[in-house]
Amino acid sequence: MKVVVVGCTHAGTSAVKSILANHPEAEVTVYERNDNISFLSCGIALYVGGVVKNAADLFYSNPEELASLGATVKMEHNVEEINVDDKTVTAKNLQTGATETVSYDKLVMTTGSWPIIPPIPGIDAENILLCKNYSQANVIIEKAKDAKRVVVVGGGYIGIELVEAFVESGKQVTLVDGLDRILNKYLDKPFTDVLEKELVDRGVNLALGENVQQFVADEQGKVAKVITPSQEFEADMVIMCVGFRPNTELLKDKVDMLPNGAIEVNEYMQTSNPDIFAAGDSAVVHYNPSQTKNYIPLATNAVRQGMLVGRNLTEQKLAYRGTQGTSGLYLFGWKIGSTGVTKESAKLNGLDVEATVFEDNYRPEFMPTTEKVLMELVYEKGTQRIVGGQLMSKYDITQSANTLSLAVQNKMTVEDLAISDFFFQPHFDRPWNYLNLLAQAALENM
């Protein structure tokens, strides 16, 4: 069996390992256009901020490891064409310019995503940068050495983490976002209010509800100003963090896709062509809160889907369980966890919900110290089905987001969570765990 894997970051690396573990006889050929694999882009802000000293530590695999497992790994090869009728892949060696065409029995599309680049006048100016891969991380580090004024465009996780990194390294930082709140997809207003105040207190200039209209360059062609409808900001460097779109042009009109280009897959990672599989940022996910297809480019989704490709390559063995989009964030000492829909995003997902916000100490007051936990539970009206939750504290409560994630995945109700069994030990929690208390508060509000 000949297997061709196109793209090798998180989903691709996971898929190759799973394919060879489950099908050691398979002839696996991997094409990757970059000179590295498995880069954890979520660590770029840690690298920029000096928490991670060596960017090489942000790789968890390498071509040599995959080769040792039995794969033929072709780095710096760009796939230019996929012929789904003849079942062939044509790739170009970016070092020599030579092209080659190979046949496949099974094709795995793990081509990932690429940052969205809005068509803003002046966006081609020097020092307007993207933040996705290893080479871009190194460019940001190098450019930041001389930059005093940094503008970050986009208030999602990557943008916010970069803001923190630049503040910690002494830069003057402006955050521009078209929405009126930061982290709008992940947190509701009670949480973002706290975090926005934290940013302002740290000297960050927040320009929320503002879209960039133009970038202005100086005489050397370097970005100098960022202009919005009501303001303009001086800048030595701009980082664009406005989201991602799937890299799936190679299969356009050849398999079913969402309007944004994300490849539709079934629960076994098969596309509309049963011999073509897709996983990671190039593919859709099944979003459990709304029971719909969605596009959520997260490394956690990628590694799970990649593993499933290997399990289901020749027969349908292990079904995808879907995702809640569970995520965590560390920002200026705050530990934050989120899963499922927010109250605000629920409407966009076709859900009619209520939400309860509750705050309590994570452990008894008789202990020498404790910390407040701010929580929210989002649940369907009528059914009480839990569809989302958020937590934030100076204490690390982020693993509780995983607990809420399981509650969403398993369609638990508010009543279920209110009386669920959790341990009690005064070092760690109270006789009623704070998640119990959150759900009990929700019951009181019904």
Curated annotation (Swiss-Prot):
Pfam families xrefs: Pyr_redox_2, Pyr_redox_dim
Keyword Membrane listed: no
Post-translational modification: The N-terminus is blocked.
Record: active site: 10 (proton acceptor), 42 (redox-active)
Molecular function terms from GO: NADH dehydrogenase (ubiquinone) activity
Cofactor(s) named in the record: FAD
Coiled coil: none
The record's free-text note on cofactor binding: Binds 1 FAD per subunit.
Modified positions (Cysteine sulfinic acid (-SO2H)) in chain numbering: 42
Subunit structure as annotated in this protein's UniProt entry: Homodimer.
PANTHER family for this protein: NAD(P)H SULFUR OXIDOREDUCTASE (COA-DEPENDENT), PYRIDINE NUCLEOTIDE-DISULFIDE OXIDOREDUCTASE DOMAIN-CONTAINING
Role played: Catalyzes the four-electron reduction of molecular oxygen to water.
Protein name: NADH oxidase
Species for this entry: Enterococcus faecalis (strain ATCC 700802 / V583)
